[in-house]
């Protein structure tokens, strides 16, 4: 937030910390983890949207959601979940960001590790096919982070491409 280190001589002051915490409090709503069913999470997100005018709902991580239904296969559950999130986004005029971690990526014969995409999450191509946009944050071996947009359904959302950012462990920021 301030670009200052978390420790050492030039860390933020107590007054700056309080300003930062006030900013977080006024710009974010955190839901408790008492009920992690998708219905409960979306019901509470809808209330937050109505109360605060929020335009972004972020669910992190995906595998924390409980969606189990008797007699419904895993891939069908994933499809139903993603379609439900998309419908919620349209009904409430907000962006829904679902943070999902891919399966382990194995090295290619040339020694490189491919960057994951929506096809590499939870054994379902639905993460690629249903999403309007898809991003991967991939830590490279040189300590840099590669941000790849592997899908952008609409041109006003953005375009497919990538950039490399350097992480600053002192401030927790990227440049």
Q: For each predicted feature, which ranges?
A:
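Cytosolic-facing regulatory segments adjacent to core modules
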Residues: 1-53, 67, 162-163
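Solvent-exposed, flexible loop/coil residues
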Residues: 6, 10, 125, 169-171
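Core recognition of P-loop NTPase motor domains used across DNA-transaction enzymes
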Residues: 20-25, 88-91, 157-159
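P-loop NTPase motor core
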Residues: 33-148, 152-155
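P-loop/Walker A phosphate-binding loop and immediately adjacent motor/lid segment at beta-alpha junctions
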Residues: 142-175
């Amino acid at each position: 937030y301030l670009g200052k280190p978390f420790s050492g001589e030039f860390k933020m002051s107590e007054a700056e910390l309080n300003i930062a915490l006030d900013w977080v409090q006024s710009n974010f709503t955190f839901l408790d983890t008492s009920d992690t069913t998708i219905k409960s999470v979306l019901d509470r997100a809808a209330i937050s949207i109505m109360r605060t005018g929020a335009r972004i709902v972020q669910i992190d991580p995906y595998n924390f959601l409980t969606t189990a239904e008797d007699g419904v296969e895993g891939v069908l559950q994933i499809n139903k979940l993603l379609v439900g999130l998309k419908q919620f986004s349209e009904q409430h005029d907000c962006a829904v960001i679902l943070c999902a971690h891919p399966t382990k990526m194995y090295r290619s014969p040339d020694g490189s590790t491919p960057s994951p995409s929506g096809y590499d999450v939870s054994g379902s191509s639905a993460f690629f096919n249903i999403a309007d946009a898809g991003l991967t944050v991939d830590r490279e071996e040189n300590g840099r982070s590669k941000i790849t947009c592997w899908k952008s359904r609409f041109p006003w959302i953005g375009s497919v491409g990538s950039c490399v950012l350097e992480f600053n462990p002192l401030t927790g920021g990227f440049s």
